[in-house]
């Protein structure tokens, strides 16, 4: 080991190993597919509590629901959700 070395494997050794690519050729596509399913099934909207694209505007409310006064924000949000 050279002076100041932490004893860890060099990064070039890791990314040129067959074991690295066997593991990552499975995990990287699996993460991509899991993320795509999370968003496409709508679970992301449910998990984070955001409205779906068709729920931003209802039949009764066509204006943009923007909170304009920070001190009366609760009342404004209640008015937006009551309509």
Swiss-Prot record:
It is a single-pass membrane protein. Keywords: Electron transport, Heme, Iron, Membrane, Metal-binding, Photosynthesis, Photosystem II, Thylakoid, Transmembrane, Transmembrane helix, Transport. One of its GO terms (molecular function) is iron ion binding. SUPFAM superfamilies: Cytochrome b559 subunits. One of its GO terms (cellular component) is photosystem II reaction center. Heme binds at residue 24. The keyword Transmembrane helix applies. Its main location: membrane. InterPro entries: PSII_cyt_b559_asu (IPR006217), PSII_cyt_b559_asu_sf (IPR037025), PSII_cyt_b559_CS (IPR006216), PSII_cyt_b559_N (IPR013081), PSII_cytb559_asu_lum (IPR013082). With its partner (PsbF) binds heme. PSII binds additional chlorophylls, carotenoids and specific lipids. The chain crosses the membrane at residues 22-36. The keyword Heme applies. Its cofactor is heme b. GO terms for biological process: photosynthetic electron transport chain. It is found in: Cellular thylakoid membrane. Heterodimer of an alpha subunit and a beta subunit. PSII is composed of 1 copy each of membrane proteins PsbA, PsbB, PsbC, PsbD, PsbE, PsbF, PsbH, PsbI, PsbJ, PsbK, PsbL, PsbM, PsbT, PsbX, PsbY, PsbZ, Psb30/Ycf12, peripheral proteins PsbO, CyanoQ (PsbQ), PsbU, PsbV and a large number of cofactors. It forms dimeric complexes. Belongs to the PsbE/PsbF family. NCBIfam families: cyt_b559_alpha. This b-type cytochrome is tightly associated with the reaction center of photosystem II (PSII). PSII is a light-driven water:plastoquinone oxidoreductase that uses light energy to abstract electrons from H(2)O, generating O(2) and a proton gradient subsequently used for ATP formation. It consists of a core antenna complex that captures photons, and an electron transfer chain that converts photonic excitation into a charge separation. This is Cytochrome b559 subunit alpha.
């Amino acid at each position: 080991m050279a002076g100041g070395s932490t004893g860890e494997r060099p990064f070039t050794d890791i990314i040129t190993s067959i074991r690295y690519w066997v593991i990552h050729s499975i995990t990287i596509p699996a993460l991509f597919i899991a993320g795509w399913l999370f968003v496409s099934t709508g679970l992301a909207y449910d998990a984070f509590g955001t409205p779906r694209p068709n729920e931003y505007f209802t039949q009764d409310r066509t204006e943009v629901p923007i909170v304009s006064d920070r001190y009366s924000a609760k009342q404004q949000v209640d008015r937006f959700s009551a309509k």
